[in-house]
C-alpha cells in the first residue's frame, strides 16, 4: 500500500509539472500570464486582505488555493474552437488572465484611494513586477504613513429640534475626538443618524442631508471635523425650512391588490368595503381574511409618530402569513394645518389557498427495494386567519430479503397519515395581546399515525404535538415543544422473532424497542446565526458562525403524579399508564459551527458538537429514537451511518447495539469552488458515541474520563458538491485514520496502514454537513 501511495504521489508530481509547462499555451507572444498578485502593508491596522477588493485584475483561480486546475483544463483544448470537445473544455475551464498595465495602474490608484479613505492621507502605493518567461508576478507595496486624527469635533445643525434630539443620543455616536479620520466611519455615522431620525417621525429624511467639513493644519496630521445637518429643501430651487416630523393619519387596507395593474388608487378593482375599529378595509368580492388578522399585524396606529422600523416589522408580519403572496405599504402626505400627516395604504395580494400534491418514490432499505406513494392536501387559510392546514396520506411496500425460515411471508407494508394545523400567532390562554404582538410566534398542532406490517411483527405508532416557533431579530430562532406524546404499540410479534432475538435477553436495547411504550416529553431549542457580509471599511467580512442548543425532558410530570397517587409499579419496577410504562430522561445538545472566508472561491469551516441523554427514575434506557449514533454523511465520514461506536465496541452487525447516550463530534473542512456549479472539499472528522452505563452486549462502550479521549475516531477525505442554487447535492468519500475498535497499531492507525476495502466509506447527502 505504501508503494501505491508513492506511485500516486509521483504521478501527481508529473501531472502538475506538465500542467505548469502548458500554463502559457494560449498567452500571446509579448504578453504575460498574470501568475500572482500580492499586497504588502507596513501598517498592522491595515490588513492586505482588506485591500484585495480594490485589485482590478486577479490571477486565474486556484483549487484549494494550490492548483490552477481550470486554467489547465482550458489549455487542454485545441486551437480549433469550432470543435465540440474544445468548446466544452473552454466552457468548463478558465481562460488565461493576460497581464494588463492599464488594470494594474487602476488597481494602484484604487488602493491609494482606499488608504486615504481610511485616514492615511499620505499613503503611497508602489507597484513592481517579476517576470519569468511568459509569467508575471505583481506586487503592491503600501506605505501607509501616519494616519490623520480628528482633533476637534463640532456639529452644525440648524434645526434646534433635531440638534436637541441628537444631543441626547450622542453616547451612541461613532465619531469621537482622537479617532482616525476614516471616511467609512463618517459614512456609517451618516447612516446611523438617518436611521435614528427615520425611526422618530422624519419620513422624508435621507443621509444626503448629512455632510462634513474637514480642516487640516498644514504640517500636522490633525483634522478639525464639523458635521453639518442641512435644512430641508424639496427641490434645488426651493427655499430651506426645518425638517418635519410626520404622524400617521388614516390606515386603509386593500386586500385584492394586483401587482400587475396600476398602483393608482382610483384604478384598483374594489367592489365593497367595511370598517373595523376605525380601519377602512376595501376588497373585491369577498374578504378572505378576518379584519382582526389585518389590524393585529400592524406595528403602528393612527396618531403614532412615523417609524420606519415599525413599517419594516409590519412588512415582516404580513410576510409570515401564508394566505398572502405580496405586501406593499404606501404613504401619501396629508398636511393638516401645521401638522404633517401620512395616510397609509396597506395593499395585499392573496396567495393560492388550496393545493393538492402527489409524490411517488422508490425506496432502498439495506438493499431491499420498494415503492412508496403519498398524496397531500393543504389549505393556507382555513379559518380566514391564515391558518395552514395539511393532511397527508402515505403508503409503502417493500420485499424483504434474507429472512430465515419460519415467517409467513416476506412483504413489508406501511400506511400512514399525518395532519397539522399552524396558527400565525401565539395561542395560549391568558396571554395578552401586547405579548402576542411582541412575540410573533407560530403555533403548531400535529397528529400522526403509522401502521407497519412486517413478517416479524405488527407495529402501530401514534403521536401528537403542540409547539411554538418564532424568530428574533432575524438571527435567532426559538422553538418550544410544549408537549409531545408518542405511543408505540405492538399487537403481534412472531414466535420465530421472539425466539431468535427477544427472548434471549442479551440485548437490553433490542428488548426495550420491541415493547409497548409511551413517551411524553417537552423541550426547547435555540438557534443563532450571525450575519455574514457585514461591511467594515468597505470590505466584506463574511466570517459567520452559528450556535445551536437543544434541551428535552420526558416523564417528569407523570413520575411526580405517579408517586403522589401512590401507583403500584409493574414487575419491572416501572410506573405504567394503562399498563404501558413511560420513558423518563433528560437530554441536552450544544453545537457550534464557524465559516471563515479566505477569498471569493475558498473558505474554511469548523464544527464541534456535544450531546448527552440520561435515563433515570422510571427508565433504565433511553428510547432508541432518542439515542445517538455516529458515522454517516453528517458525522465521522470514514464510517457508514450507525457503524461507529460506542467507545471501542467493534460492532456485531446489529445497528441497535451501535447507539449511545453521549456524543462528541468535531470537523474541519476546507471548501473550494471548482468550476461551473461544482465545489470541492477536503475534510477531517473526529468523534464517537458512548453509553452512560456498562452493558454486556456493548463491551468497551461505556464513557470513562480516563480513556474516552483514546476512543476518539478520526477520518479524512474528499468531497464533491453540486450547487443547484435551491439545494446542494453532496458526495463525500471518507477514509478511516484512527479506529478505536482495534488496539493493535496496524489496525488502530489505518492512516499508516490504509486498506481501501476496509477503511473507505461513501456518502450521498443534500446540503452541507454543518
Annotate each PLM feature.
Residues 280, 362, 403-407, 507-513, ...:
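Extracellular loop and loop/strand-boundary signature of outer-membrane beta-barrel proteins
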Residues 199, 338, 355, 408-609:
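Transmembrane beta-strand segments of outer-membrane beta-barrel domains in Gram-negative
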Residues 722-726, 756-770:
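Outer-membrane beta-barrel "beta-signal"
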Amino acid at each position: 500500500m505504501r508503494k501505491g501511495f508513492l506511485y500516486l504521489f509521483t504521478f501527481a508530481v508529473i501531472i502538475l509539472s506538465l500542467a505548469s509547462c502548458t500554463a502559457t499555451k494560449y498567452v500571446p507572444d509579448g504578453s504575460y500570464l498574470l501568475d500572482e498578485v500580492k499586497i504588502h502593508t507596513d501598517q498592522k491596522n491595515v490588513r492586505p486582505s482588506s485591500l484585495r477588493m480594490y485589485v482590478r485584475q486577479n490571477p486565474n483561480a486556484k483549487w484549494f488555493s494550490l492548483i490552477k486546475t481550470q486554467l489547465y483544463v482550458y489549455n487542454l483544448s485545441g486551437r480549433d474552437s469550432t470543435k465540440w470537445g474544445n468548446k466544452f473544455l473552454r466552457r468548463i475551464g478558465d481562460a488565461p488572465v493576460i497581464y494588463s498595465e492599464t488594470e494594474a495602474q487602476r488597481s494602484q490608484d484604487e488602493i491609494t484611494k482606499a488608504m486615504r479613505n481610511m485616514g492615511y492621507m499620505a499613503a503611497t502605493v508602489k507597484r513592481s513586477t517579476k517576470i519569468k518567461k511568459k509569467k508575471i508576478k505583481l506586487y503592491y507595496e503600501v506605505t501607509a504613513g501616519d494616519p490623520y486624527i480628528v482633533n476637534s469635533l463640532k456639529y452644525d445643525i440648524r434645526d434646534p429640534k433635531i440638534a436637541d434630539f441628537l444631543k441626547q443620543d450622542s453616547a451612541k455616536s461613532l465619531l469621537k475626538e482622537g479617532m482616525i479620520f476614516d471616511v467609512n466611519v463618517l459614512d456609517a455615522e451618516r447612516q446611523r443618524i438617518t436611521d435614528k431620525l427615520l425611526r422618530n417621525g422624519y419620513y422624508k429624511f435621507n443621509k444626503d442631508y448629512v455632510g462634513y467639513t474637514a480642516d487640516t493644519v498644514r504640517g500636522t496630521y490633525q483634522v478639525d471635523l464639523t458635521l453639518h445637518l442641512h435644512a430641508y429643501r424639496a427641490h434645488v430651487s426651493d427655499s430651506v425650512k426645518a425638517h418635519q416630523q410626520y404622524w400617521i393619519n388614516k390606515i386603509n387596507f386593500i386586500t385584492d391588490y394586483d401587482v400587475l395593474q396600476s398602483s393608482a388608487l382610483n384604478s384598483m378593482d374594489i367592489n365593497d368595503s367595511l370598517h373595523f375599529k376605525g380601519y377602512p378595509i376595501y376588497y373585491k368580492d369577498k374578504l378572505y381574511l378576518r379584519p382582526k388578522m389585518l389590524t393585529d399585524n400592524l406595528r403602528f396606529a393612527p396618531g403614532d409618530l412615523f417609524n420606519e422600523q415599525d413599517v419594516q416589522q409590519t412588512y415582516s408580519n404580513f410576510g409570515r402569513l401564508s394566505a398572502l403572496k405580496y405586501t406593499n405599504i404606501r404613504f401619501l402626505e396629508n398636511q393638516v394645518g401645521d401638522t404633517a400627516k401620512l395616510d397609509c395604504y396597506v395593499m395585499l395580494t392573496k396567495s393560492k389557498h388550496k393545493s393538492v400534491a402527489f409524490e411517488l418514490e422508490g425506496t432502498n432499505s439495506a438493499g431491499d427495494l420498494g415503492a412508496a406513494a403519498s398524496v397531500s392536501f393543504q389549505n393556507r387559510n382555513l379559518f380566514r386567519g391564515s391558518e395552514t392546514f395539511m393532511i397527508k396520506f402515505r403508503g409503502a411496500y417493500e420485499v424483504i430479503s434474507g429472512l430465515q425460515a419460519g415467517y409467513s411471508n416476506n412483504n413489508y407494508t406501511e400506511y400512514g397519515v399525518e395532519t397539522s394545523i399552524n396558527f400565525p400567532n401565539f395561542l395560549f390562554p391568558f396571554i395578552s395581546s401586547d405579548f402576542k404582538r411582541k412575540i410573533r410566534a407560530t403555533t403548531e398542532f400535529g397528529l400522526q399515525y403509522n401502521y407497519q406490517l412486517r413478517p416479524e411483527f405488527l407495529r402501530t405508532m401514534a403521536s401528537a404535538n403542540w409547539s411554538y416557533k418564532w424568530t428574533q431579530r432575524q438571527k435567532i430562532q426559538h422553538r418550544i415543544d410544549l408537549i409531545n406524546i408518542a405511543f408505540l404499540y405492538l399487537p403481534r410479534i412472531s414466535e420465530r422473532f421472539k425466539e431468535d432475538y427477544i427472548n434471549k435477553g442479551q440485548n437490553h436495547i433490542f428488548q426495550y424497542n420491541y415493547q409497548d411504550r409511551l413517551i411524553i416529553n417537552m423541550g426547547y431549542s435555540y438557534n443563532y446565526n450571525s450575519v455574514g457580509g457585514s461591511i467594515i471599511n468597505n470590505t466584506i467580512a463574511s466570517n459567520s458562525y452559528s450556535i445551536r442548543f437543544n434541551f428535552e425532558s420526558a416523564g417528569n410530570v407523570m413520575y411526580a403524579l405517579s408517586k403522589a397517587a401512590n401507583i403500584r409499579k409493574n414487575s419491572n419496577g416501572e410506573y405504567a399508564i394503562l399498563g404501558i410504562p413511560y420513558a423518563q430522561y433528560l437530554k441536552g445538545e450544544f453545537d457550534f459551527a464557524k465559516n471563515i472566508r479566505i477569498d471569493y472561491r475558498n473558505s474554511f469551516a469548523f464544527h464541534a458538537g456535544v450531546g448527552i441523554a440520561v435515563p433515570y427514575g422510571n427508565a433504565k434506557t433511553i428510547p432508541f429514537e432518542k439515542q445517538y449514533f455516529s458515522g454517516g454523511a453528517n458525522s465521522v465520514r470514514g464510517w457508514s451511518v450507525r457503524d461507529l461506536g460506542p467507545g471501542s465496541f467493534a460492532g456485531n452487525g446489529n445497528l441497535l447495539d451501535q447507539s449511545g447516550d453521549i456524543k462528541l463530534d468535531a470537523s474541519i473542512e476546507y471548501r473550494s469552488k471548482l468550476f461551473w456549479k461544482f465545489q470541492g472539499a477536503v475534510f477531517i472528522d473526529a468523534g464517537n458515541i458512548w453509553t452512560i452505563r456498562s452493558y454486556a452486549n456493548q463491551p468497551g462502550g461505556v464513557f470513562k474520563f480516563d480513556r474516552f479521549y483514546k476512543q476518539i475516531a478520526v477520518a479524512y477525505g474528499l468531497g464533491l458538491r453540486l450547487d443547484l442554487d435551491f439545494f446542494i447535492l453532496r458526495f463525500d468519500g471518507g477514509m478511516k485514520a484512527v479506529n478505536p475498535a482495534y488496539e493493535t497499531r496496524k489496525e488502530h492507525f489505518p492512516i499508516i496502514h490504509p486498506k481501501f476495502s476496509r477503511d473507505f466509506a461513501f456518502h450521498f447527502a443534500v446540503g452541507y454537513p454543518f
